Amino acid sequence: ELVLSFETLEERGRQLAERDPGFLDQAIEKGSGTDTAVILYTSGTTGTPKGVVLSHDNLLITSRNAAKFDRITPDTNSLAYLPMAWVGDNIFSFSEAFVAGFCVNCPESSATVMQDMREIGPDFYFGPPRIFENLLTMVMIRMEDAGWIKRKMFHYFMGVARRVGGRILDHQSVYPWDRLLYGVGELLVFGPLKNALGMSRVRVAYTAGEAIGPELFDFYRSLGINLKQLYGQTEAAVFVTMQSDGEVRSETVGAAFPDVELKIAENGEVLYRSPGVFQEYYKNPQATAETKTPDGWVKTGDAGYVNEEGHLRIIDRAKDVGKMNDGSMFAPKFIENKLKFYQYIKEAVTFGDQKDYASAFINIDLDAVANWAERNNITYGGYQEIASHDKVRGLIEGCIMEVNENLAADSHLRSSQIQRFIILHKELDADDGELTRTRKVRRRIIAEKYGTLIDALYSDQQHVKVESQVTFE
């Protein structure tokens, strides 16, 4: 009785319609747009996850606006591969599909997502930055294993793509010779690469949930993939700002989304008000009052500003933005995203608030570094051994030096150049409480857990003893 075949369910529906033709209309009439539709939980980056109560109006109004914004139609095809408990997938793979009527495909399993992407070829795609980082790492590993002719061709045409790919995507003018070269690159490199990524048919792709490194963002757009940034929260039913076609910038997250009001508080915190604003935190009136003002403004906890084009730029979490001892701004997430652009760096945590200089914890990407080690005849027995190898340290130091050169050119952040770093002996893990389940860094916990290592970075110590407890699930 608890498990029915679909045919049985359809037959029961037909019988009900015959017995009571007005049942459906009456059921709809009893409901209200303010009724609770779903309770989704925050990631818990700043503490215990909170249940965000969203109404039917929250979901439907924002989803209709989103479908209209990027011309999402019933002909659209998408792949739902992220947890539906996350607001991003809940909106893009359920609510928007409900109002626009497009086809949502589900992968056979988590292990077949890439294969399913290639087979389905979605034209509407959403993923957090970590997904795009992992895909880029996979591409770079494959290129390093390729023959010298393929490597040379890849790097040459990627140079062309970086120079003119974004302009071509935005329908801007480029020299005929560059357009011709880009066309050859599309045939020989970009097209096959997009097909390998399952993105050959993507018309619009979004990323959100974490800031994405400008270099990573520009890489995908240079291939002709219409990747756009949006800024949102669970509390907003996703949408706060969104980038419009032709107004895409790597350093901003777009202008206010339709029906969204945006303002910046005196302390630099971003606030918004919209039809998507959540009803309350489930059974947590204190947190609700702290986050949502009586007149409906939501405090995001993020620091940012609106530039002269009306686009929002997020600097960092408001509570994380600090000052170095020389009075200059220190924005850890901004620096970490630059570090994570490099295929050999999987995760980074930076320190500098109330310090004389900036430092960093680094997690290497084991797959990428192992591939590099094999090509350089370096043997190792596991993560800890390869992470402590002198040549691996030199590899990571080279990445950090390039980031420092970039920071040196920014008048606001030149004091944030990284002077000392540690390659951690273990990977940061959600099971150990160091990351959230969406792989966001939990800074407070890391600072408490690895306090002796942080102290060592700001002393003359060359060696320090550390004991770690690892959880396996």
Regions found by a protein language model. Name each.
Residues 347-350, 402-473:
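Conserved C-terminal "lid"/linker of ANL adenylate-forming enzymes
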Residues 277, 311-340, 369-390, 410, ...:
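Adenylate-forming
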Residues 42, 256-324, 341:
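Conserved ATP-binding/catalytic segment of the ANL
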